[in-house]
Swiss-Prot record:
Subunit-structure text: Heterodimer composed of CysD, the smaller subunit, and CysN.
EC number: 2.7.7.4
Gene: cysD
Name under which the protein is recorded: Sulfate adenylyltransferase subunit 2
NCBIfam families: CysD, PRK05253.1, PRK12563.1
Pathway annotation from the record: Sulfur metabolism; hydrogen sulfide biosynthesis; sulfite from sulfate: step 1/3
Any Pfam family: PAPS_reduct
Entries under HAMAP family matching the protein: Sulf_adenylyltr_sub2
GO terms classed as biological process: hydrogen sulfide biosynthetic process; sulfate assimilation
Organism: Pseudomonas savastanoi pv. phaseolicola (strain 1448A / Race 6) (Pseudomonas syringae pv. phaseolicola (strain 1448A / Race 6))
Enzyme class: transferase
Amino acid sequence: MVDKLTHLKQLEAESIHIIREVAAEFDNPVMLYSIGKDSAVMLHLARKAFFPGKLPFPVMHVDTRWKFQEMYRFRDKMVEEMGLDLITHINPDGVAQGINPFTHGSAKHTDIMKTEGLKQALDKHGFDAAFGGARRDEEKSRAKERVYSFRDSKHRWDPKNQRPELWNVYNGNVNKGESIRVFPLSNWTELDIWQYIYLEGIPIVPLYFAAERDVIEKNGTLIMIDDERILEHLTDEEKSRIVKKKVRFRTLGCYPLTGAVESEATSLTDIIQEMLLTRTSERQGRVIDHDGAGSMEEKKRQGYF
């Protein structure tokens, strides 16, 4: 008698198959590591795929210099514990221009420090495939993207120019200068991610758990006071509105552009229970998703992950 795979084991097997396919099919793949929960699961799956050997490709963090301090500490800890080959890239042009989310706004900051930074890094190292942790349930433009997402020589995505992926068969043929973005977690949901983290004991950034944190409400979004830089861009009136609230984060990005949610979830079981009851998107706290109608699709057309 053959035991049937559970839902999570089926997802795990599918993701591991995709990761191995890319490693075998492409000359120079890389795994993007954004330090969030999806990256943690994807990295865990990749390590399973090649255990007991090491990952046959590096991991890369495109750093905007505005991530939460806890994220940087967690990244360095994981790199040391897992012996990862980490590449960190910061857009030097953005640094020279002093780009930041306060002075230049979320759209320009994201374009220069994330999108252009990513394209620079991919070109610099000659990567022909890049793994990412995006899922179809996150956002409408990601819902119509394939597992193998083809990009032209300028890293642009054309949603009308995609290949069929019938019966889990993936066509990785690309012309010189072209590349693909690969999404092994495409068919996972946010709840799947949390249940898998719980079952596998995957370490995650503590920001996902509720705790008393200093926040300020700006345009209906709770922004955490993560370091002194944000205070330079607040008026005295805004500073007077900084309060302590028990909050956590469902998604993590640049801290001035990532909203917290009020929560009592201090453990993985609490978070899973919360996910079973919630009716809002995890990306509701991402300021960059509200830059305009179809903003995420437009960003992806320009090369954003």
